[in-house]
Every structure is written in structure tokens, then in C-alpha cells.
């Protein structure tokens, strides 16, 4: 975050800088003078002392999940920092976060009115918008219903239990063919490059009823846009935290707006095509389902929340964007961990060989018979914590947590990385050990421990696509492990250092994938 703000200030002229600094200082002093009074019986939030204008950005640094975890050791599970001029409450610890997001869920269910959020899906994003509770709940319910109904529809042939299973199985098989072609031509492959297109095709099938070739320029362009979006959002936008910067030239903000405009244009085009060919008696995909809802029921069951056509585009945009970025990141990390721990990769293959066999493709119903694979996925979620924070929350009223007063409209960061690496929850948290989730005899997954892993948020803002995401990661991975063996290039060490963003990616690299030969039987 500091890295985003400081270069921007340096780019201003001396006169511009002077005006900006004086103005911001005056506003800062005025705000400080009207600071909230603490109600009797409650305490003021602890935290590091902020500098004028930039707050605590220097202490937060370029890896906030680590620096805020360290601050939590000093100040506790509820503390306050200041980013620019905006106070931010940071929550850590499983019990504290559970108290805030579940037991006091309504009070922490808001989204902060950040300047950059207004440009995501033209301000109509389900995930980022500051819609009032009634509007947001109606849209969330609609999106969840559409996701669930289309993921559980019967497949086109008896071979598949549902549409989701069919899409994943077909794309996984196509991915294996692509990797075989690339390996023969180049001798190595970039895991993220090929996985992300396969995952994007699954969500394209669900949302739009179509798939794209792995070399389709339109889809590749969108994949790159999504990656850029995650980097910009994850880094923090200076204008979100120093309001005066909204009115000054800002290259980062200009790039951010351009990314969102191009993304929404792609979705608008497809939604328009769906409107033109819409047939109420032939609902083809999630987009058709949402259109049908708008045509039939402009109001929800309480007759007080209108669902506009524009917000349909926003919902589809959210489902599409989040649907491939999160899952492709999880799968790409999974392949990296397979390479980093070859003995675990072999044990996973043996589990598949014994419980599924090698003569058929794994299916969703095999999942309960593959406890090592399930624990491997849980440990990837925990150890990588590739979603280190949830999307920022916001308090909807004056409230308190752990005895500390938190005013209405306070921005709240949830440190998922800290929970997943908390030594009070996990033995040797820095070690990668899937066995931590297995029963003593290795035949069952400890569901209580599994639920402690935080990657999809919690409570009212929990990711609506979580069940689909978990199923997709499992089935893609099961098919890949059954058919391929992954390793790194000779003499090239594997770099598992994450690159910070909204979703933390591993560094781009080249790996090898070889088909499991007949002798493996």
C-alpha cells in the first residue's frame, strides 16, 4: 500500500505537492478534533500511532498480511491502523473473527465506500458495492439460487451426475491434451497459463453456455485483465485512503478504470446477446436464469427491492471474474505443491489408484473416498492462504468487539492469513503437512479442523461460490493427478514465494508434466 502512495506523491510538482499537503493536513486536524467519544464501559482501539497524511502505510509495507500479523501480536486481535487518512480496524484470531462475522454478522456486513469500488461493475458489483442490506440480500439470494440450480442440473449424458461435473471433466481432459501438446513442442509448460483458461471455460460454460479455445485472444485478454485487477486491488488505491487524490491525476486509477471498463464491456456484450435470443421456455445458463428473473419478477418476495438489468450484468461479472481467478489460483498452487512434495504426489496417486482405479475418470461422488486428497487441498488453502484478506468489511452501526468501541462506517480488514498460521490453532503452522487434517488411521478428514481454515470468508459475506469452488478444485486435481506426473526442470529450484495481490499468485515458472504410463498400473 505504501508502495502505491509514495510514488504517486513524488510525481506531483512542487506547487501541487504543497497545496495537497496543506489541504490534507487541515482536513486531518479537523477530523482529529471531532474524533468519536468512547461510550462508558468501552475502550479506545489500540494500535500504532499514525503519521499525518500517510498514516501507517510505511509500517504496513508491501506484505500487509505479515506486518499486520506481527502488529496483532503486540496489540491483540482487535486493533486500529490508519491507511492514509482512513481508520481501519484489523481483526485476527479465529474466535474474534467468528464473533464479528457470525454472532455480530449484521453489524460487520457492510462494504466501505471506497472510491475505487465505484468503478467495479460500474458500481453494481454484488461483492464490492455498498448497497443497502435489503437490496444486497435480494441480489445475493438470486445469484446463489442461479449458481446452485445450474451446477446441480443433470448432465447431458448419464456419465455425468450434473452439469458442473460435466464441464469440469471435459475441461480437465482437454487441459491434459493441451499439456501433452505443449510438452512435446517445448518440453515444459507454465502452469498458470494453461490452468486459468481451463477454469475460465468452466465458468464460461456455466454463465454463458459457451467455451473458448485455449488460444482465443479475447479470453486470454480477459484472463490478463483479471490478473491485473487482482494486483491493483490488492496493492491498495491511494485515492481510497487520501480523498483529495481523487481529484488529482492518477495513473493507477486510470489503469484500474480501464481494466473494469474492458471487463464489463465483455460481459455486457454477452448479456445483450442473451437478451436478443432469450426464450423463457429454454433457460440455457446462469445469464438466462437472471434475465428470466428480471422479466418476471422486478420485485423480490417482499416487494421492495428492484432488480435492474444493469445489476444482472454486475452479478454475472462478479460470478465470472471471481469464478476463474480464485479457482485457477488454487489449482495452480496445487500443482506447485505437488512438485514441491513429490512423496505426497505419489501417495495421492496411489490413493486414487486404490479407491477410484485407473480405468475411469474420478467423479464428484468419489470425494469422500479420497481423504488424503481432501486433506491435501485443505492444507494448500491453509498454508498458501492465497486469499490473505477478505474483501474489506464495514460496520453498519456503532458497535463494540472484545470491549473496544468501533464507530459506524469503519473499514474492517479480516486477516485470513493470520488465522491460517495461528500457532494457537495449528501445530507448526509454517510446515506443509496434510496429515494434520487426517484421523489417526488416515481414513477420515477431521471436519472440525477443516472448518478452521479460512479462505472463503465467513458469515453473511461468505463467498457464494464456495461449494462450487471446492468441488472444482477437487475434481480438476483428482483427474490431473490420476493422469499426469508433475516435476520441475532439472537444476531449477522451485520458488514458492507468493506475490501479493487480491489473490496471491506464485511466480510464473516452467514445469514438466508427463503421462502416467501403463506400468503405473
From Swiss-Prot:
Family named by the database record: Belongs to the cytochrome P450 family.
Keyword set, alphabetical order: Endoplasmic reticulum, Heme, Iron, Membrane, Metal-binding, Microsome, Monooxygenase, Oxidoreductase
Function: Cytochromes P450 are a group of heme-thiolate monooxygenases. They oxidize a variety of structurally unrelated compounds, including steroids, fatty acids, and xenobiotics.
Lipid bilayer topology: Peripheral membrane protein
InterPro entries attached to this UniProt entry: Cyt_P450, Cyt_P450_CS, Cyt_P450_E_grp-I, Cyt_P450_E_grp-I_CYP1, Cyt_P450_sf
Binding-site residues for heme, renumbered to this chain: 463
Example GO biological process: progesterone metabolic process
Cofactor field: heme
Reactions that this protein is recorded to catalyse: an organic molecule + reduced [NADPH--hemoprotein reductase] + O2 = an alcohol + oxidized [NADPH--hemoprotein reductase] + H2O + H(+)
Organism this protein belongs to: Chelon saliens
Gene Ontology cellular-component annotations: endoplasmic reticulum membrane
Main localization category: endoplasmic reticulum
GO molecular function, one term: heme binding
Subcellular location: Endoplasmic reticulum membrane; Microsome membrane
Disulfide bonds: none
EC number(s) recorded for this UniProt protein: 1.14.14.1
Keyword Ribosomal protein applies: no
Name the UniProt record assigns to this protein: Cytochrome P450 1A1
